Structure formats: structure tokens, C-alpha cells
């Protein structure tokens, strides 16, 4: 059950914050001495997505995940937008070494690396160092987006990328998003059937799944083995009336699992036994709560949803 303060913060983010930009919060670095939480029993592997705590460095995201009680963390090697803080994350860099040191010190594992946008000019060979770095960190999943209007070319490039990534033990899952050229689960299923690669997958995220009017049967009809992991958050009942609004909400005003309008218990029935990445970025909460406290709140709420789904 959410406290009154937490419900107020969630509501504020869902209403006043949904349609206006929020300023970036200034927060102190996370340390292992910040706070002591009671251990949580995780029914599945649960990862802290990079976007959820993008206001701290990748190295501090590892510490945040560890202190909050996550089993895994997501690492953003390549920025998703030009406005976010840039880190040197490919190869043997100081930040990569700091991330490695924190992984070793905490025992947290890397679930996924991001983001690989498949564009018209994408060439698989140019992503070799990205895959090498991901393998170095122990990642098993790569978050991809389909950003090429020529679906045949996108499909060919995706197949080549999967082939290049396979020796590194990496699965490449395209995340269907309403504003991308690969926008639905059904469409990604068609691409998966064409390329027939064992390390190709479909990444389901509730905010995109429901905003693009996907159907549960589209998940069930994916080729066997296509679901490698999933993302979880919650959403407002009110849907933005423009694509820009949908995109802005997805990047800035997601809700904590189980506190919004999405039927996550039903969705989880179609995503059984998968590792979960909590991607619940919320710009308003970032102004009032530390990255660590947000991460812990999201984890507690996610475990509550899993328990409600009969997973303990």
C-alpha cells in the first residue's frame, strides 16, 4: 500500500507534470552508506533501467540498484537523446572501469545495454565495440529501436546485427514504440519470423503496448523464444492526444508499477518467467525524491504487483 505522501507525489506527476516540462533535479552521488532497506524477496530477476535514474551516472546507477535491492541494472552505453548527459562508455574508459568496479563490489549484474537504433545508415560492423563493451560488463540483452522507414532494409540490418552479436552472448530485442517505424508487437513478430535468428527478440513495455493499441494475442503469437525480457511501469488512464505528447510522457512521466491504469497483472500472464526491467522515469518525482528512494519505491511496487499476480 502506498503512503499518502507517495500517492500525492504519484498524482502530481500524473496530472500537473504530464503536460509541462520539469527542471532537472540536482542530487548527490549515491553511496553504499546512503540508506539501509530491508531485503526484498524478488519473484523474478528485476533490473533498474538506466532511464529510471538518468539523473546519476552509470557507475552510481549500479550503486543505486544494489542499495535499493535490485538483482540487475541496465547500462546506457549510447545516449538515447542529444539532451541527456553524455558519458564515454565504449571500450576501456574511466567510466566503464568505474562501472565494473561497482558491479564487482555489489554483486549486481547487468541485464541490458542500450540503445541500438537501427537507422537507414546503420552498419553492423560499426557496432562491434558496443557489443564488446556489453559483453565485458556481462550483459545478456540489447535494447533496440526500429528507426528506418524501409522495413526490408531494417530487417536485413537487424539480421546482420544479430549475427554479429551472437558470439558475445547478446540477444537483440526491438522495442516496438508508437513513434518508431517498428511500432507494434505484431509488426515485430513479422520481422522476427523473416530473420529467424535465435538471439532476436521483442521487448514489451506497457506504456508503448497500451498506447499503440496492441493486443495480448500479439504477444502470444510471437515466434517461440522471442521474449527475452520485459520492461514494466504504469501509465495514466488519460492518453495524450498527440504523438509528441505520447513520446514526452514515455520519456518523462511514467508511473510506478501498480499505481496507474495499466492492467499489469493481466499483462504479466503473457510475459511469464521473464526478467523485468523497471523503466519508470518521472521528472516530477526526480524533483522531490532521491534516485535511491525512487528506485526502492519502484521495486517495492513491482514486487507487490508480482505478488498480486501470484508470484512470490
Regions found by a protein language model. Name each.
Residues 30-52, 100, 104-116:
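Mobile, glycine- and charge-enriched loop segments
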Residues 81-86, 174, 212, 284-288:
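A short acidic, helix-capping loop that chelates divalent metal ions and anchors anionic groups
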Residues 12-21, 62, 66, 102, ...:
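Active-site acidic/histidine proton-transfer and metal-coordination neighborhood
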Residues 49-53, 78-80, 115-118, 146-149, ...:
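Active-site beta-loop-alpha junctions enriched in small/polar residues
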Residues 87-95, 122-129, 149-156, 183, ...:
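Alpha-helix N-cap and loop-to-helix initiation/capping positions
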Residues 2-47, 59-71, 185-204, 210-312:
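Histidine-acidic metal/acid-base catalytic patches
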Residues 74-98:
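Glycine-rich, proline-tolerant flexible connector loops at the mouths of alpha/beta enzymes
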Amino acid at each position: 500500500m502506498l503512503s499518502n505522501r507517495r500517492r500525492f507525489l504519484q498524482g502530481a506527476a500524473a496530472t500537473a507534470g504530464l503536460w509541462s516540462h520539469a527542471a532537472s533535479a540536482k542530487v548527490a552521488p549515491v553511496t553504499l552508506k546512503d540508506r539501509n532497506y530491508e531485503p526484498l524477496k524478488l519473484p523474478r530477476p528485476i533490473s533498474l533501467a538506466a532511464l529510471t535514474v538518468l539523473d546519476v551516472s552509470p557507475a552510481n546507477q549500479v550503486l543505486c540498484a544494489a542499495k535499493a535491492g535490485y538483482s540487475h541494472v541496465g547500462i546506457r552505453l549510447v545516449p538515447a537523446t542529444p539532451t541527456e548527459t553524455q558519458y564515454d562508455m565504449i571500450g576501456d574508459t574511466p567510466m566503464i572501469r568505474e562501472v565494473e568496479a561497482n558491479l564487482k563490489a555489489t554483486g549486481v549484474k547487468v541485464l541490458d545495454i542500450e540503445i541500438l537504433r537501427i537507422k537507414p545508415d546503420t552498419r553492423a560492423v560499426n557496432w562491434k565495440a558496443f557489443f564488446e563493451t556489453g559483453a565485458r560488463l556481462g550483459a545478456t540483452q540489447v535494447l533496440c529501436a526500429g528507426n528506418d522507414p524501409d522495413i526490408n532494409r531494417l530487417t536485413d540490418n537487424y539480421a546482420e546485427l544479430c549475427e554479429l552479436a551472437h558470439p558475445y552472448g547478446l540477444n537483440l530485442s526491438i522495442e516496438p514504440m508508437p513513434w518508431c517505424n517498428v511500432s507494434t508487437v505484431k509488426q515485430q513478430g513479422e520481422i522476427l519470423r523473416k530473420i529467424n535468428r535465435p538471439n532476436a527478440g521483442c521487448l514489451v513495455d506497457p506504456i508503448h503496448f497500451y498506447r499503440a493499441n496492441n493486443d495480448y494475442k500479439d504477444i502470444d503469437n510471437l515466434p517461440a523464444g522471442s521474449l527475452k525480457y520485459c520492461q514494466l511501469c504504469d501509465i495514466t488512464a488519460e492518453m495524450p492526444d498527440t504523438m509528441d505528447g505520447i513520446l514526452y510522457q514515455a520519456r518523462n512521466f511514467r508511473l510506478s508499477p501498480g499505481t496507474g491504469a495499466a492492467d499489469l497483472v493481466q499483462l504479466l500472464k503473457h510475459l511469464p518467467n521473464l526478467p523485468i526491467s523497471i523503466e519508470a522515469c518521472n521528472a516530477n518525482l526526480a524533483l522531490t525524491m532521491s534516485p535511491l528512494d525512487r528506485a526502492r519505491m519502484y521495486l517495492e511496487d513491482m514486487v507487490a504487483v508480482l505478488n498480486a499476480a501470484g508470484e512470490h
